[in-house]
């Protein structure tokens, strides 16, 4: 659970700080309606409009998990372990993972474009691989910091409880 939250926070952080070229910046700004989309085919525009919905869903999920993690700070190790194990595996065979995710999230098939299309030339697969690696590394760092802080508090609480029992 916490690792998923760390992944989402890392995603938004990398999204803000990633070194984009001008065309990529324009595309990201268009997703957030801060700029008009560049000339694209109807299929590319339909794909980008769906991507907008996924960005909104990711933002809602991030906020929801932040609130939930704040109210329920106990770890969910089974979810965390699954995410920690699956994340590097997805990076090992990124092309296949990328294709599978697109088949799941875009079942109507509007994610396959010619190699010379605007989207493919602006944000090629290598861009998403670098973005994903940066997101994963930052998520691991955030999770490590959270774990250290959480366990420091837990150990302190445990030792305090233990010493009060022993002093009785």
Regions found by a protein language model. Name each.
Residues 5-20, 76-99:
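Hydrophobic alpha-helical membrane-insertion segments
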Residues 9-50, 97, 117-118, 123:
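Long, glycine/tryptophan/cysteine-rich extracytoplasmic
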